[in-house]
């Protein structure tokens, strides 16, 4: 049985004050939810150490929003997988459209980042998804396959053991417009079926999250879909009470 996973991607938001207040509040609101749902937050890199200190003793994990391809060296401004492991991060987001678009990261770059994370025993959270134009041309499945194939060809099927896939239709990210839950289920089922053709056991255990304007109002309906194993939450993860509501919705849906 797959355990639901909800991750908060803070993107370029936060402060020392926010980190401490947010985590204290979230811990209080989730105090009776031990082992009901896996939870992580991914603040900006500069706040990882502070977040880790406030997360200590809780079941909330630390995530990060990016990783570099290199272990060490003259790469100004970058963070390696080894460093993320050293600071206590567990879930590392890669392939997000904002990285693909603004930093020109290719599918090959993302596959190599995936490999770096696996080599350090960290859990990649691989973001895949299509643009509005690709969706309108009914190319969603083909785009998802292309993005998955880079991982399968470079790293191999076994790399998806203890990994996470986040289906994030690009047209739904930070727009307030979430995809229809039945459409989401259809794509999640397709992704799982595609992996099933490579390895049945891995397909059945891999966590497939949804990302794209997830909020307190639509979370319950999303999580009621059998192949939606959680969410990668953006803006709604910046307020502890809203994020807690989403987490509780995941726990309730997957408990039934």
UniProtKB/Swiss-Prot annotation:
Chief location of this protein within or outside the cell: cytoplasm
Database matches in InterPro entries: Aldolase_TIM (IPR013785), TIM_sf (IPR035990), TrioseP_Isoase_bac/euk (IPR022896), Triosephosphate_isomerase (IPR000652)
Gene Ontology CC terms: cytosol
Reactions mediated catalytically: D-glyceraldehyde 3-phosphate = dihydroxyacetone phosphate
Statement: the UniProt record of this protein carries the keyword Acetylation: no
Quaternary context: Homodimer.
Name of the gene: tpiA
One GO biological process term: glyceraldehyde-3-phosphate biosynthetic process
Gene3D superfamilies: Aldolase class I (3.20.20.70)
Keyword rRNA processing among UniProt keywords: no
Localization in the cell: Cytoplasm
EC number(s) per entry: 5.3.1.1
Pathway linked to the protein: Carbohydrate biosynthesis; gluconeogenesis; Carbohydrate degradation; glycolysis; D-glyceraldehyde 3-phosphate from glycerone phosphate: step 1/1
Protein name: Triosephosphate isomerase
GO MF term set: triose-phosphate isomerase activity
Pfam families: TIM (PF00121)
């Amino acid at each position: 049985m797959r355990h639901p996973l909800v991750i908060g991607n803070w993107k370029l938001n936060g402060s020392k004050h926010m980190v401490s207040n947010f985590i204290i509040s979230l811990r209080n609101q989730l105090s009776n939810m031990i082992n009901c749902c896996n939870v992580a937050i991914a603040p900006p890199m500069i706040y990882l150490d502070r977040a880790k200190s406030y997360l200590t003793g809780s079941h909330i994990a630390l995530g990060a929003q990016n990783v570099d391809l290199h272990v060490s060296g003259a790469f100004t401004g970058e963070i390696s997988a080894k460093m993320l492991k050293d600071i206590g991060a567990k879930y590392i987001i890669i392939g997000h459209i904002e990285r693909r678009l603004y930093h020109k990261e290719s599918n090959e770059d993302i596959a190599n980042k995936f490999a770096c994370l696996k080599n350090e025993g960290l859990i990649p959270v691989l973001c895949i998804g299509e643009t509005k134009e690709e969706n309108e041309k009914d190319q969603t499945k083909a785009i998802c396959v292309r993005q998955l194939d880079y991982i399968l060809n470079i790293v191999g099927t076994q790399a998806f053991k203890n990994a996470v896939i986040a289906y994030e239709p690009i047209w739904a990210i930070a727009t307030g417009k979430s995809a229809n839950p039945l459409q989401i289920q259809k794509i999640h089922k397709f992704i799982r079926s595609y992996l099933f053709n490579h390895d049945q056991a891995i397909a059945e255990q891999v966590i497939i999250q949804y990302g794209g304007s997830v909020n307190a109002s639509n979370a319950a309906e999303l999580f009621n879909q059998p192949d939606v194993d959680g969410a990668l939450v953006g803006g709604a993860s910046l307020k502890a009470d809203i994020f807690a509501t989403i987490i509780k919705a995941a726990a309730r849906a997957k408990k039934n």
